Amino acid sequence: MSIVTNGNLNKYFQQIKNLKEEFVKKYNSGESTEEIIGKMRQIHGQAIFEDTRNKFQLAKNNKLNPSDFYNLSVDYCTLANMDKKIRHLEILQFERKHKGYTHKGLDTDKYEINRSLIRSNGPLVGTTQPIQSTQANQISMTGKGTQDPVNKVRPEIRKDDDGVDVISLHNTQTEDVTTRRVNSDVIPTEFNNTMNTQNQSNSNYLNTTEYLTNLSNTEANRLMSDYNNGNYELTDSQKQQGGNHIFEVGKPTVVNFYADWCGYSRQFMPNWEKVRDSVKKKYGERIQLSSLNVGQDTDKVNISKNAGVNGYPTVVIFKDGNTYHKVAGNASADDIVKFIDETMSR
């Protein structure tokens, strides 16, 4: 039986979340927020003390099982997440007080506490200073992305000096070129042998990482509009021993972005499998599902950021040129299915 539990830490986490909402209201009305920040730090300190006491009891026992190590990881993530939320608000407060920062009010109706960034309709507030979101990746807190005009994308394939197949997506309007090396066995024979654009656009096959890289780097909305008849190959999370799954870009695609080092990601996995089963029964071939283990791979981390992911696990739906996000760490299977249902009804 596990000795360590994180139930008490969740109590402190909820208190900080509630104070964060209070901070937003006072911040928008121009009132002082210093007292709220002070309360949040006190609560965080209480959580640290509680965690230290748990660790002390654990150290005295000297008999740890796998569940104990799992909970240690979850507790660490919980404490770190508390501090991250407080730091974001401290930065807001500091910039307004010391730098003459002219703020734009935080919209509480479109404000989701679970995100590691505070997003409003205007600025995105991160760990340094507010940055203006671009039209391509701007996402409101209701989940719907900003839609761009459709640009034409032309796929091209060639072999590099090492004889490795290289696939490029060439945006003919912006002149952006996304190039990726791929194994020849993931590109069908008719694609290798046929170089005209019409046939290529109907025969695109890539693995999960390649698909998401191209989807995000050339902007999901443009690709989805332009490749309605194209196919990509995504590695299905249940077939990681070599099996592959053909995904059509024109269909809604649900991706679970997770990291194997994250306790919340591991905790969410059983719920994700329930989501998969439920969605497949309900929607059949109308929805495509996959997972991407970001791990500590730099390319995959960039992919997740380009897709609007700010923490793990996060479920992202690519639909009709828009992206919709749901932070899944504390979400139940029913929560995710409801999120998918609401998105599909848009």
From Swiss-Prot:
One Pfam family named in its UniProt record: Thioredoxin
Keywords for this protein: Virion
Segments forming domain Thioredoxin: 212-345
GO molecular function: protein-disulfide reductase activity
InterPro entries (UniProt xref): Thioredoxin-like_sf (IPR036249), Thioredoxin_domain (IPR013766)
Location relative to the cell: Virion
UniProt keyword Lyase present: no
Keyword Ribosomal protein: no
Top-level taxon of the source organism: Viruses
PROSITE patterns registered for this protein in UniProt: THIOREDOXIN_2 (PS51352)
One cellular component term from this protein's GO annotations in UniProt: virion component
UniProt protein name: Thioredoxin domain-containing protein R362
Protein source organism: Acanthamoeba polyphaga mimivirus (APMV)
